[in-house]
Amino acid sequence: MINKMIKEKMVQKLDYDNIPNFKYIMPNFRNLEYDPDNEYSVPYTWGTVGIIYDETMIDIPPEEIDWDILWNEDYLDNILMFDNPRDAFAIAEIKNGFSLNTEDSDELIKAAEDLKAQKRIVQAYVMDEIFDKMGAGDALIAPYYAGDALTIMDENDSLNFVVPKSGTNLFVDAMCIPTSSKQKEAAEMYINFMCEPDIAYANIDYICYSTPNSAAYDKLDEDVRTNPVSYPDQDFIGEKTTVFVNLSDEANLQMQTLWTEMKSAEDENANTWIMPVFLIACIVFMIAVQVRRYIKSKKDIF
């Protein structure tokens, strides 16, 4: 999104003289693809997309879990799936060994075909509802965001979260200043305040997302810093995660079109049942009418 806002001139460049606390931002969260020189944004939180699942019902070692589990028919009607094309396509793309930023038309078509094949076993396409459904045990498995997964796991101890071994999306929430802002210096001072170690620590401790702030990270309890949900192995992060960048208009249009076709195919499948049921109902109705007429004619005779 930041990359898109930069291209559309929706955000303005930052004056780092007003943001000295940027020095606390870890090197591996600087100069990411969406803002290569950090001219427009300061990282705020980060996390990974992974899989949350009921480990009492899914007896697979965490290190063996990969994205293809979301296509496993053993979990028919117990799988939740993201209800937005970018996240859903990313899962199918990684499953196929593609980049989650691919613009290759054939690769997008292949990802869409996989999503269409998966649809039959998916209980629901949802976003925020994943929290309630997984927390209540209404589903067994779903893709989800690490920070939110930690919150659900506090409420339901049968749940576990794993980052699939083949890789995933690394998301970074960042602070920017809109082009329309008339108080740029004040906004920069606020960003600096949010990067103050004590403030950044208190914020992260409350919202449970991961911090890119080295001083705030050092203040975290040892069990938090070593939790693989919040802070996966850094070698894995470097080798197996990718941030989203803005796709071309053509790729976005193709993805959206394929997504719409995939979702509407669900209705088409439903319609294949409607017509036969309607015809059967008509036949039954006609038979009933004929039977009533026959009975009535007999009564009239006698």
Positions of PLM-derived features:
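A ligand-binding cleft/hinge motif common to bilobed small-molecule-binding domains
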Residues: 1-4, 141-158
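Periplasmic-binding protein-like
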Residues: 108-117, 155-179
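Extracytoplasmic ligand-binding site segments that recognize negatively charged/polar headgroups
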Residues: 1-138
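Mature extracytoplasmic/periplasmic domains
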Residues: 178-239
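Structured segments of extracytoplasmic/periplasmic soluble domains
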Residues: 4, 8, 17, 73-74, ...
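Short secondary-structure boundary segments
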Residues: 55, 83, 146, 206-207
